[in-house]
Each structure stands twice: as structure tokens, then as C-alpha cells.
Amino acid sequence: MYFREAVSKRIYELCDKYNYIPNKLAEMSAIPPTTLRSTLANNVENPSVYNIYKICKTLKISLKEFFESDLFNFDKFDD
């Protein structure tokens, strides 16, 4: 798995957990919907930490909580 895939999966997990659809999350996070859609489709090579921060702020979670997932286990990443 690539980092961008882990980010996409984590955002989907959090959308499910907090009952957000991606477009609403984008709107509430002040992220252009096209940017979030591209991130979720794995079309963004290096997802922006700033956009992840804005998502975390909207969901009222820390960056630590965002990345505290087995998805971000370095052993699972392809280079």
C-alpha cells in the first residue's frame, strides 16, 4: 500500500465514523471538493498535511488520532 492509499482509506473510515459524506467534509473543512475527490481517488501523490489538518479540525480530532491507525504501519507501505 502507498501512503496516499492509506490517507484515502483513513478519510473514508472517518467519514463513516462521523457520518460525513466526502463533499460535506470538503465543504466543512474548506477544502475544494475536487481536491478531496482526487485525494480519495488516490490521484494525489503526496496528500497535503495541511488538508489533513483541516479535516482533523472539522472532525475535532488530533493529527495524532488521524495517524493512529494500522493503515499507517510503515511495514505495510510500498516505497
Which residues are covered by each model-predicted region?
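Short alpha-helical "recognition helix" segments of helix-turn-helix
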Residues: 25-26
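Short, basic-rich loop-to-helix N-cap that marks the start of a DNA-contacting helix
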Residues: 43-57
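Short, charged recognition helix plus adjacent turn
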Residues: 1, 38, 67-79
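Recognition helix of helix-turn-helix/homeodomain-like DNA-binding domains
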Residues: 30-47
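A short, Lys/Arg-rich alpha-helix, primarily the initiator
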Residues: 1-21
